[in-house]
């Protein structure tokens, strides 16, 4: 089903993307805030590590990035994650022996 009128042309404004305009997305800071498991992180992360998601994500464990990405996208495009303060999202890495807890938050510039 299409939103196009009978002429096949969409009304003005309907072609705009939803969410924040490209280049205007907020910066996201990702911090390791806790470790629940007994073993050291295989990537070397520890509580207190802080990363700028856009600049430093190559320095972060790929598993933590993979888990955090949906939450970061939610924050970037104006959504909220249930059970978290607005502008923040907590998630855990999937390594069962480590279980680092990460906090993603919007950085006001």
Predicted segment positions?
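Short, Gly/Pro- and small/polar-rich lid/capping loops
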Residues: 5-26
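Short, structured beta-strand/loop micro-motifs enriched in basic residues and often containing a Trp
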Residues: 26-37
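Short, charged beta-turn/beta-strand-edge "cap" motif at the junction between a beta-strand
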Residues: 35, 55-61
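Short, compositionally biased
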Residues: 62-79
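Short, compact, well-ordered microdomains
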Residues: 78-109
